[in-house]
Amino acid sequence: MPRLVMKFGGTSVADLDRIKNAAKQVQREIDNGYDVIVIVSAMSGKTNELVGWVNQTSALYDAREYDAVVSSGENVTAGLLALTLQESGTPARSWQGWQVPINTTSAHSSARIMDIPEANIAEKFATGMKVAVIAGFQGVSAEGRITTLGRGGSDTTAVAFAAAFKAERCDIYTDVDGVYTTDPRIEDKARKLDRISYEEMLELASLGAKVLQTRSVELAMRYKVRLRVLSSFEDVTENSGTLVCDEED
């Protein structure tokens, strides 16, 4: 069965109602015939709150404990989305980075993904699971410690899973309905692009566009992962959003 990766950012899972909406988006793709891997961010504002707690707790900076704390927001979101899907009758299971495992370097707070073995999740798909909900932004080092990938790391997680599982596409759900020539929230004349090349997307990112994290676009370009940027808050059709792909695709 074909696989699809869907990534939901913090605003898309900001509260329980939005998590329910994300579950509906996932169910639509199951109905379209996909096994779905969902990557989730922490609920909007939660990571900043966790960072604040760390800073209030100790003036000492321990990178390993910092990552252990700030990665927990994604774990909460993953569990809540899996429960929401189960409640509607969809076989779903949440996975934290160490459970997959998402193997990374030991550079805490800026780790790089080295490897994502397919076996554990593929086995669950083979036995009836329809949705794997993955906590983004995190992994595990060779020393067995939780690591984080840096701000925007959930985008990188999503692309890495799409490459590892040979997904048909990686859909990035956010609070805008695609990639624009400039920020539509501050510029009325901003124009939405139906498709854009990896190189053009990297150029926009270098100029400050925050729709996709730069590292995730570089990874998508390397492994030829087709990306689609969509709004969580609009009905999705075949022509929705912006497709980010190879110029010749």
Model-derived features: where do they sit?
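Nucleotide/pyrophosphate-binding catalytic subdomain
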Residues: 1-218
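Short, solvent-exposed amphipathic alpha-helical segments in soluble enzyme
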Residues: 54-56, 222, 246-247
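Structural preference for solvent-exposed beta-strand-turn elements
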Residues: 222-229, 235-239
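Long, charged amphipathic helices and adjacent flexible linkers at domain junctions
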Residues: 233-249
